[in-house]
A protein has these predicted regions:
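Cytoplasmic helix-loop-helix junction between adjacent transmembrane helices
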Residues: 1-26, 220
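Helix-to-loop junctions at the C-terminal end of transmembrane segments
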Residues: 153-165
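Extracytoplasmic gate region of multi-pass secondary transporters
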Residues: 96-155
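A late C-terminal transmembrane helix in Major Facilitator Superfamily
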Residues: 23, 32, 218-243
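Flexible cytoplasmic inter-helical loops of multi-pass small-molecule transporters
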Residues: 71-93
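Paired small-residue
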Residues: 191-199
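Helix-loop-helix hairpin linking two adjacent transmembrane segments in secondary transporters
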Residues: 24, 28-75
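Structural signature of the two symmetry-related core transmembrane helices
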Residues: 168-183
Length: 243
């Protein structure tokens, strides 16, 4: 769903693409803020299997209705057809051309670093809790800081992308993530968990927006769907490899 949403937004918006993408990702980040605490509370009153059943039924019942009412009045058109002023003439790259471009390889490796490493951290968080002697709910509580940082960064990133372009922001994207890993290595206090996950949230906020806007800036939007499909597949592989 996130792939479809970000691709559609990248095609539809031009001059305000950064802000539009940051708004689109707001829902996911909000869920990341609310769901960990909600699930922990739910586990105290019911079995985890029942929780999955409730979530599945809720999605089946409400997602089609919500989707229908949100998009029924929207006429989606591509960047080439909408009324925004196009400031630059970008070559429309096909996916077969993109994979031969050295810039794609360099940028993709930069973007894949965080999902690769962070997924490993999230999957083995119980080991981190044990190794650090943190409380049982320390990381779950820290995920709220992660989500807040991610949401705030989304809107900052959207503004900065529209002002400075994605290419100029890419080099800064993983710096907070690097600092978070250093905190994880060298600090033992439970408080450090909040800084650790908060900084990951900052990088995540940048990555969510840059992961779509960068490709649109570099390669145009005519074939952005197939390009995003490739990068999303690489991201999924990197998360599996990270574990």
């Amino acid at each position: 769903m996130s792939h479809t949403a970000s691709t559609t937004i990248s095609r539809y918006f031009t001059n305000t693409r950064g802000k539009a993408l940051s708004t689109g990702w707001f829902g996911l980040s909000t869920a990341e803020f609310l769901m960990p605490v909600t699930i922990i509370y739910a586990l105290t009153i019911m079995d985890w299997r029942n929780i999955w059943i409730i979530i599945s039924v809720a999605i089946i019942l409400f997602l089609p209705l919500v989707s229908y009412f949100l998009v029924k009045e929207v006429k989606l058109s591509s960047r080439e057809d909408n009324n925004e002023v196009i400031k630059e003439n970008i070559k429309q790259w096909k996916r077969s051309e993109v994979i031969k471009d050295y810039r794609f390889i360099i940028i993709a490796l930069n973007m894949l670093a965080m999902p690769w490493i962070a997924t490993g951290i999230f999957v083995y968080q119980s080991f981190i809790l044990s190794a650090k002697n943190w409380g049982e709910y320390t990381i779950a509580q820290s995920f709220m800081v992660y989500s807040i940082a991610s949401v705030l960064t989304l809107f900052v990133a959207g503004y900065l992308i529209d002002k400075f372009t994605s290419r100029k922001l890419l080099i800064y994207m993983n710096i907070p993530f690097l600092i978070s890993l250093l905190i994880l290595i060298y600090f033992q206090s439970p408080v450090s968990s909040f800084f650790f996950l908060g900084l990951i949230g900052v990088s995540n906020g940048f990555a969510n927006v840059l992961g779509s806007s960068t490709w649109a800036e570099l390669y145009g939007v005519k074939f952005i769907g197939s390009i995003k499909a490739l990068t999303t597949a690489l991201m999924v592989f990197s998360t599996a490899f990270g574990t």
